[in-house]
Amino acid sequence: MRAFTTHTGLVAPMDRANVDTDLIIPKQFLKSIKRTGFGPNAFDELRYLDKGEPGQDNSSRPLNPEFPLNHARYQGASVLLARKNFGCGSSREHAPWALEEFGFRAIIAPSFADIFYNNCFKNGLLPIVLDEAVVDSLFAAMYSEEGFQIEIDLQAQTVTSAGQTYTFDVDEFRKHCLLNGFDDISLTLLDAEKIQTYEAQRRQSQPWLFNAVHQ
């Protein structure tokens, strides 16, 4: 998992409340057993005028001209500015996979669905909760200034834009994991030597548990 320390990036809007995980990555793309390949279909039903299917060549599909992420001014955006209850709906982990692969490093919103919020930290995305009034001001600044960027410092827990700095809360353990790029597997591997020692001791004390064939 990619570590997150500081990041300065172009901001793109998702100016609607209650964006659910089916909008983030529609259900027909969940058939894959891999965790990669979802980025091209992030927000598929909003980005395109037709219905997408797995493995389809998106280059020939008609784009929705009204969807902000299709606008030239937001190309290359790495910070998504959203409204309340972002990531609601089903608990599919494919949603943060798709957003991260699309190019986003952080999402700023007044609130997130709990499971989606947790999944973001496990997949290298930083979900930031700011007061709704602050989010409103960021939307206004973004719409008025093409190329609007935000600077995020996870260690300091700050968001800075246009000379204004805002602080956000984050659980210390989640912060530690994201700063160091630790997902569940890499955290476990930190204790690999202890695990191997424990398994060796169990094989000696309880060998019957490890017999391939029980007599």
Curated annotation (Swiss-Prot):
Gene3D superfamilies to which the protein is assigned, alphabetical: Aconitase, domain 4 (3.20.19.10)
Q: What is its EC number?
A: 4.2.1.33
Instruction: Keywords in alphabetical order, please.
Output: Amino-acid biosynthesis, Branched-chain amino acid biosynthesis, Leucine biosynthesis, Lyase
Class of enzymatic activity (EC top level): lyase
Instruction: Output the superkingdom of the source species.
Output: Bacteria
Q: Does the keyword Lipid metabolism apply?
A: no
Q: Name one GO cellular component term.
A: 3-isopropylmalate dehydratase complex
- Gene Ontology terms: biological process: L-leucine biosynthetic process
Q: Pfam families given for it?
A: Aconitase_C
Q: Which residues form a coiled coil?
A: none
Question: Which GO terms fall under molecular function for this chain's record?
Answer: 3-isopropylmalate dehydratase activity
Catalysed reactions, as listed in the record: (2R,3S)-3-isopropylmalate = (2S)-2-isopropylmalate
Its UniProt pathway annotation is: Amino-acid biosynthesis; L-leucine biosynthesis; L-leucine from 3-methyl-2-oxobutanoate: step 2/4
What this chain does, per the entry, is described as: Catalyzes the isomerization between 2-isopropylmalate and 3-isopropylmalate, via the formation of 2-isopropylmaleate.
Task: Outline the subunit composition.
Answer: Heterodimer of LeuC and LeuD.
In the record, the note on similarity to other proteins reads: Belongs to the LeuD family. LeuD type 1 subfamily.
Protein name, please? 3-isopropylmalate dehydratase small subunit
Q: What is the lineage of its organism?
A: Bacteria, Pseudomonadati, Pseudomonadota, Gammaproteobacteria, Cellvibrionales
> Corresponding gene?
leuD
